[in-house]
Structure formats: C-alpha cells, structure tokens
Swiss-Prot record:
Listed SUPFAM superfamilies: YajQ-like (SSF89963)
UniProt keyword annotations, A-Z: Nucleotide-binding
UniProt record similarity statement: Belongs to the YajQ family.
Top-rank taxon, per record: Bacteria
GO molecular function list: nucleotide binding
InterPro entries, sorted: DUF520, UPF0234-like_C, UPF0234_N, YajQ-like_sf
Record's protein name: Nucleotide-binding protein Suden_0039
General function of this protein: Nucleotide-binding protein.
Entries under Pfam families matching the protein: DUF520
GO cellular component, one term: cytosol
NCBIfam families: PRK05412.1
Length: 165
C-alpha cells in the first residue's frame, strides 16, 4: 500500500505574533520624534478582528500604517492580513482608519487555488474543507511543486502551508 502525503493551505494568523507587532508599534511611535506632542492610537479589537488607527493628520496616519506593516513583516506576518475598510474623520480634527484582519480564504479564491492545482496536471487532489484546502498526493515532490507554484502566484489572502504529513 502506497503512502499518501498531504498538506493544508490556509490563511491562519499567529495571533501572538500579531499582538507582539502591535505592541512594538506602540513602543516605537512613543519614541519617535515626529509623533511627539501629537495624538495617535493603535487599537486592536480582538472580538471584532479589527485594527483601528487614529492620528492627527493624514501624513501621521500614513506613517503609522508604514510602521504597522514593517512590524508585521518583522514578525513573519504578511501585510495582506490587514484589509483597509474605511478612512474617516474622528473627534478633534483627527483621522481614523479601520482595518479588518483577514484570517480566512474566501470561497472564490479557494476555488481558484484548487483550479490552479488541478491545472498543474500532477497526481494530486485538492479538496476545499471550510476555510482551508487539503492537498493530497502520493509523491512528496509533487506536493512541493504545488507549494512552489502557489507561493509564486499573487493571492489576496495571506496563505500559509501547514500540516505536511
């Protein structure tokens, strides 16, 4: 009986790393000269999976976004985990931007990924299971080709390859 190998493609986020990145943002902004004497806030709402940033101007808000993305990348998280929802005026001449935290693969994108895997013409199967995709195959080399191909393509969700068995 031949051994079958598999792995999962998902968009899970290491929430501890995410929280660490947000804490590092607070520390860096508190020490930056260009933010001295201005109002700013970076608030992570865990229940709603939202990140809310408030700054005194659009320039400060852009700088805050750049700092957040830099810290996420240093924690090995993709910048795609944040999806900008809306930018609006806040109290006291402040600007506010809300980001939704993306930790799932949408069904349309999951279908596209499964179709791409099928188009590779390898002896592997891709099965959509909720918010992840299980890829099975008899050869490890085929699975590694699938991973390399999917990684090389541009996707909306921050894809993670896990549970290689």
């Amino acid at each position: 009986m031949a051994k079958e190998y598999s792995f999962d493609i998902s968009a899970k986020i290491d929430m501890q790393s995410f929280k660490n990145a947000i804490n590092l943002v607070d520390k860096e902004v508190a020490n930056r000269y260009d933010f001295k004497g201005t109002t700013y806030e970076v608030d992570y709402k865990e229940k709603d999976k939202l990140l809310v940033m408030v700054a005194s101007s659009d320039n400060k808000l852009d700088a805050l976004k750049d700092i957040v993305i830099t810290k996420l990348l240093k924690q090995n998280l993709s910048s795609k985990v944040l999806e900008e929802q809306k930018t609006e005026n806040s109290s006291g001449n402040n600007r506010k931007v809300t980001f939704k935290i993306v930790d799932y693969i949408e069904s349309k994108e999951a279908k596209k990924i499964a179709a791409e895997i099928k188009n590779l013409k390898l002896k592997v199967t891709a099965q959509i299971e909720g918010d992840s995709i299980r890829v099975k195959g008899a050869k490890l080399d085929d699975l590694q080709k699938v991973i390399a191909t999917i990684r090389s393509m541009e996707w909306e969700a921050p894809l993670v390859f896990e549970n290689m068995r």
